[in-house]
Amino acid sequence: MTKITNDLFLKAARKEQVDRIPVWYMRQAGRSQPEYRKLKEKYSLFEITHQPEICAYVTKLPVDQYGVDAAILYKDIMTPLPGMGVDVEIKSGIGPVIHNPIRSFQDVEKLTMFKPEIEVPYVLDTIKLLADDMLDVPLIGFAGAPFTLASYMIEGGPSKNYHQTKSFMYREPEVWAILMEKLGRMTANYLIAQINAGTSAVQLFDSWVGALSRADYAEYIRPVIEMIVREVKAVHPTTPIIMQAVGASHLLAEWETMPLDVVGVDWRETITSARKKVPTKAIQGNLDPSTLLAPEKCLKEANRILQEGVLEPGYIFNLGHGVFPEVPPEMLKKLTNYIHERSEILLKKDDIK
């Protein structure tokens, strides 16, 4: 395995002292990069993610181009679902479309056992290739969290209100629990397999869970998240686990009492406020990605965020959501350099090391 010479991200995830703030970006690989767009002229998303050499190249591009302190595996949260019998298609301009949506207990019962080594060997081969030969920064693996996956599976695709998902959850609580159990087991096995293959950390993306109240989260979702984290930690107790959601600040107190290591927040929550709600966790975030299209505002906001981030150990600079396709790659490089240089000055000034 290639030696990790830049471990700033891992130190921050463990709330250790650093000399500068680590930075990486959700969706840093892919859509905004001309090299990726050129690949997409020849290959589909399916073809890219199923060819380890190409997928590893795409994953590594931001490390080489922007100088970020971590790589995140290039793939989709839908990747494992076909291994459970879900007929999913990624449609351009729409997103994931499920051709056999969940409507009943019988549909949930049909979901099959997921074995990563059998169903997604190309994912594990990509990780091994990156970890063994290509990266000197940590590699982050990830999975979609059960609520977000279930919302696609029940709605049949993207949704603005998740009415079908929530009504199914309320109307069929026992069937919902079975669905969560199946998705939870799949997610735990998937994350464990990624760590076994060489990832240094893993992130749970629960993109749409902010649609739930805290009470509903505690009743319908928390048990499965606890199970996932518990099972991963039982095998890999020192591997950082990140929880990332959007519009979910009201759930921070739930995550504080779980054995998570890092909590991602978006621009609706300040770093200072988040720290008060999750004092034992490292914080990741929280620049609004829209500012990347307004350079002056972007750097101003980045400085404001850093002023809060450097006050305590355990901070990782990121966005509150993913990079837009319209973002110029040079802006991400400029921002990365700014974060590194500015945070080093601030840390020396405040003598926080």
Swiss-Prot record:
It catalyses: uroporphyrinogen III + 4 H(+) = coproporphyrinogen III + 4 CO2. The record marks 76 as: Transition state stabilizer. GO terms for biological process: protoporphyrinogen IX biosynthetic process. One of its GO terms (cellular component) is cytosol. The keyword Lipid metabolism does not apply. Its main location: cytoplasm. It is an enzyme of class 4 (lyase). InterPro entries: UROD/MetE-like_sf (IPR038071), Uroporphyrinogen_deCO2ase_HemE (IPR006361), Uroporphyrinogen_deCOase (IPR000257). It is found in: Cytoplasm. GO terms for molecular function: uroporphyrinogen decarboxylase activity. Pathway: Porphyrin-containing compound metabolism; protoporphyrin-IX biosynthesis; coproporphyrinogen-III from 5-aminolevulinate: step 4/4. Substrate binds at residues 27-31, 46, 76, 152, 207, 321. Keywords: Cytoplasm, Decarboxylase, Lyase, Porphyrin biosynthesis. Its EC number is 4.1.1.37. Belongs to the uroporphyrinogen decarboxylase family. NCBIfam families: hemE. HAMAP family: URO_D. Homodimer. Catalyzes the decarboxylation of four acetate groups of uroporphyrinogen-III to yield coproporphyrinogen-III. This is Uroporphyrinogen decarboxylase. It comes from Listeria monocytogenes serotype 4b (strain CLIP80459). The lineage of its organism: Bacteria, Bacillati, Bacillota, Bacilli, Bacillales.
